[in-house]
Amino acid sequence: MKQPLVEAMERYLQEQVYPLHTPGHKGGRGMAEPLRSLLGSTALRMDVSLMSELDDIHAPCGCIREAQEEAAKLYGSDACFFAVNGTTGAIHAMLLTALHPGDRILVPRNAHRSVTGGLILADAVPVYVQPAYIKEFGMQGQVTPEQVKEAFAVCPDLKAVLLTSPNYFGMAAEVKQIAEIAHAHNAVLLVDEAHGPHLGFHDQFPPSAMHCGADMAAQSTHKILGALTQCSLLQVKGARIDLRHAADVMSLLTTTSPNYLLMGSLDAARAQLAERGAVMLEDALRAAQMLRNSLAKIPGLHVIRPEDVAGKYGIAALDSTKVTINLKEWGVSGVTIGEALRKEKIAVELVDLQNVLFLVTYADWAPVQWQDTVNRICKTLQKLRPVKNPLEARSVEQVKALETEAAEKEKAQQAEIPVTEAAVPMRTVFYGKKKTVPLSGAVGLICAEPISFYPPGIPVILPGERFTDKIVAWCCLMKKQGLPVSGPADTSLQTVRVLTQE
């Protein structure tokens, strides 16, 4: 399978050119140990500056252009751009390409934090919609087509709709229906497809955003496929999006010193998917099913299945390689289970108050070794399984403490993110004067920094929104349960930054 950029890199390496140019480590000779040995001499020799024979990502006319065209052909888009600043950069590019300052865009409330940055850059106005809440599992589903129709009825001037599909848990939205609704209102559909670069290559997975009519989709090739971390693709259809403008925006946001190892890994991952995609995804399904079957045997654990969510909560289908266990019956938080698994040298993708997510890919499928890993996971979980009656043989004080802890966990698990009120445009807050106040004293003030509990990074409150007593209480509740906070300058959340009101 042709790999235009990788092949050009290999030819350059074979020339044994002496570099009297950047980077300063000169092919690794000047790099400090132990990193030099860990990376290896071949990789370091390919950490080069922009060379005519290796093309220019800002004006591609050779191997990079060909590599991007091959990726577009594979995914069914009209243009594909290598995004070496990850899907964060690709999402920023989508928003800057599709929107003008002041334009309104429908945004799921659980959109990734990168969307906030993109909205500030684009000076666009978000109209938020809360995805359906799955109370049984304590997680959010998807935005429904009905919600999108209602949004256009209230805000007919919406220029775009943004979806996160699939979400962290592999739940795909009704992308085709929502694309049709958006297009009927002369709006474009932008999809954060970070967790779906593998979709469209096996019939047991949800269809891809491009195949469902999306106008742009940002994909994290590194999350599921074989590219290096930080490597993503931006797919664009040209019917409603100006492809030249998209290229200009990508150039604006991309470093003038892109790493060729990163770009080469995108080319290699694309070629691998083109040649072996169906086989790779079959391997991923086998590995996921082995884990699912074993986890399902553990009493009290519920492994979330496609039939639990598909056709409900705005969810069209579930990517079953995202293996999620729900711990509600155990009465233990996902944070606790995640920490215990890490002590056993098992690192998971995501934890929240009720769930633990295992991300399984084709690279996990080596039957004997994978079975050993699955056994380790299940053995650890069996040890953590709560005893049948934890209150037996306890003192009165211990019983009260356990009952209080259980009540607090139940309260946290049932809590939904409070509704917020936008008071000031995000861009105004970004450039405005700020001050720091105790979280307990923030009620009524304008938030000047995003606050998310991460993963999955769903904002509790965003810049420009007003703190309420419910938001402050929710933040305290989540922090007490051990969820790490992301966004504020003070990650202990004792204080928050607010807009100075003059």
Task: Label every PLM stretch briefly.
Residues I325-V332:
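Short, surface-exposed ligand-recognition loops at beta-strand->loop->(often short) alpha-helix junctions
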Residues A340-K343, E349-E502:
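PLP-dependent enzyme catalytic core of the Aspartate aminotransferase-like
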Residues N167, E329, Y362-A366:
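A generic structural motif
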Residues L5-E10, Q14-Y18, P34-L38, S77, ...:
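Conserved PLP-enzyme active-site core in the AAT-like
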Residues L44-G86:
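Conserved N-terminal alpha-helix of the aminotransferase class I/II PLP-enzyme fold
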